[in-house]
Amino acid sequence: MDYVSIEAAQATTGLTLVVNAGVPGPWSESAKALFRHHQIPFLAVPQIPATANEDLLAWTGHRNAPIAIYPSEPPRTRALELLELAERLGLGASLMPKKRAGRIQVTGWVQEIAGERGFGWCARYLIFNQWASQMSDAARAANPMFSAYGYDESSQARMLERAQSFLSDLALAIKA
């Protein structure tokens, strides 16, 4: 992927997408696929995982990826915000059903998969536990990801239960 500087992105009249650099993070990969599906060109700005990303924070108010920045609009970081922006700006087939009941289902599943405390959040938390077990206390304290996501070793059982419960519910929904 070709990345541009923050300065170049600030000068654009189109969409800028801040995405993980060097690691195929699931949220960034999903955001890129979403905007590509809707045929929306974007400039990519790199976000360096597990670092403070102070330049991004100063520009957007966020240090994580993905971040969608469209001129004269606030930065968007949540999955449903990205989906709504892509639907509004893009071309091609909509990912949203025309009927309200279907849209409610889609937005609910998006939130349950990619939203705060959703399946992806829980899975990341479980990965953090393995990662944390290989780090010193000082290294963990220096890594902004652990504090940003409220990592707490005692929450592992609850996160595992939430992830398993989601997968059970998803299996039931697919069978229905």
Region locations from a protein language model:
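GST-like domain detector, emphasizing the conserved glutathione-binding G-site
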Residues: 1-146
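A mid-sequence, solvent-exposed acidic-amphipathic segment
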Residues: 148-176
